[in-house]
Design a protein with these regions (language model features):
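Histidine-centered, transition-metal-coordinating active-site segments
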Residues: 1-207
Length: 207
């Protein structure tokens, strides 16, 4: 990039970081994603326990099978065919049908996703203390069956780095013909360090 583009790149990188935390890693997005993951995990757990879980063919194939690297090598066309055929409609159709499933956890998660009664999400710059997690867990046990609580209390972390200097750094073509890394020529360098936030996701007290 020519030297005159330095500040445009800086503005782009700042906007990129803001987009990640305000859009892609927004609380609502992360909460919904984690709930969807747990819904599928519950469906998979039920199948492995011998419980019938109805789903469209492409999704059902993965619920009732445990693919390995060897499976993809030996039955490549079959596995990839099912994977390529899996889409949002399969997932939403399954979740809608699970709203009437006998299993409480699967039914509860499905109803919440369809009706947008999403879990609360807390972000923290530091890992949550064991005491705090235990406190939330105890509160959930007063509302949900104890065996179901691990599904309703989700913990994890999200990381994002707006720019990295160790791989594929942007190169600037200076007026004198030199080619220098962007981090060396920017007056207001964007911090390359990765930002990590820890989260807890669980049902709201009134929902």
């Amino acid at each position: 990039v020519e030297e005159k583009g330095i500040y445009s790149i800086e503005k782009f990188l700042v906007a990129r970081r803001l987009m990640y935390w305000q859009v892609y890693l927004h609380k609502t997005v992360v909460a919904a994603e984690q709930m969807l993951v747990r819904t599928m995990q519950r469906a998979k757990d039920l199948v492995q326990a011998g419980v019938t879980v109805p789903a469209p063919e492409n999704l059902s194939f993965f619920l009732y099978n445990n693919p390995s690297a060897d499976d993809f090598r030996q039955r490549r066309e079959e596995w990839i065919g099912y994977f390529a055929g899996l889409d949002d409609y399969d997932v939403m159709s399954a979740i809608k049908s699970w709203m009437r499933h006998d299993d409480f956890v699967l039914r509860e998660f499905s109803e919440r996703l369809i009706n947008r009664r999403l879990f609360k999400l807390e972000f923290s710059n530091e890992p949550f203390s064991d005491a705090y997690v235990a406190k939330i867990s105890q509160q959930l046990k007063s509302v949900y069956p104890e065996a179901a609580v691990p599904y309703f209390l989700l913990a994890g972390k999200e990381s994002n780095s707006a720019y990295t200097t160790f791989k594929d750094e942007i190169k600037m073509l200076m007026k004198n013909g030199q080619v220098l890394p962007w981090s060396q020529v920017s007056d207001h360098s964007v911090q390359p360090a990765s930002v990590t936030k820890y989260y807890l996701v669980y049902p709201k007290a009134d929902a």
